[in-house]
From Swiss-Prot:
Residues 276-332 are annotated as: Disordered. Disulfide bonds join 35-109, 151-204. Residues 20-123, 130-220 form the Ig-like C2-type domain. This is CXADR-like membrane protein. It comes from Xenopus tropicalis. GO terms for cellular component: bicellular tight junction; cytoplasmic microtubule; plasma membrane. Residues 1-19 form the signal peptide.
Amino acid sequence: MHTLIRSFLGLWYVLGALAQTEIKLVADENVTLPCRHSLGHLGIQSLDIEWLSNISDHGKQVLLSYSGGQVYNAENHKGRYSFVSKYLEGDASLFIRSLQPSDAGQYICKVKNAGQYQWSFITVIVLVKPSELACSSEGAQLEGKNVTLNCKSTAGTKPLNYRWVRVNLKDNVERPVQSTARIGPENQLLLHNLSKTDNGSYRCEVSNEVGKRTCDVDVTVQSVSNTGILAGVACGVVVGVFLIFFTVWLLFHKKEFKKREEEEFFNEIREDAEAPKARLVKPGSSSSDSRSSQSGSSSTRSTTNSASRSQRTHSTQETPHGEQRHHCLEKI
């Protein structure tokens, strides 16, 4: 590296200072990469500071620089990188806002002052905390049955360490899980042959070197008899609701059927009352006598039985002949 620097500076006198550091930092936090320098006899007038990154396939990129009394930011990184407050007094450390896993890689601090160069190489390792946990219970929580408690972290720097404990949520006191419990191949907790003693809260803890996450799963074991009673009650409620709706439906349709019967009955009576009445009329009878005979005959039929009705009909038919003879005598 010294040979490369000498060839690059040509005839300049170079006092090269190299520093190599590896730093582990946590994602999503604001971090500072250290770089210190000493002002030469010319002071800040000959001071140049440059921060470069070597974290992509495009090679080295300038992130931040100071030259000629001005600070320059890379266009695509504005707002994320800056100098600390005393960069002109010997502290040229780089401030990075909200470190991301993609920021992992090598960073280079290059300071030139009065013909002297100072290099700092920093390798950044970004550590990620475990992600939020997804916890669940699988299986019927009944006496004698088996239940699986699942716990999963989808992100985080490996290795991720899983741990299950029982916890009293009132005072947050943890204690070991029962001896009959087993840890599955995917870090799930297996509870076999459940009993009332398995009731309670179970806590899953996932941790790595930079942080940890926890989640709780509740287990409430029910006896089979209680389950049968609850099922019977549920069925009874369903049947009861069905009977209520069926009774209401039946009463409604019965009322509608009765209403239709009454309407049909009154329609039949109305049709019978309005039907035309047939009668026999002899030729030669006057229209007035016919109307009088019809009115008398109709009145008589409405108040007598069938036998009387027949006799009156016969007498009514004979009356026109007598009246006709009477008119003939008057004419003579």
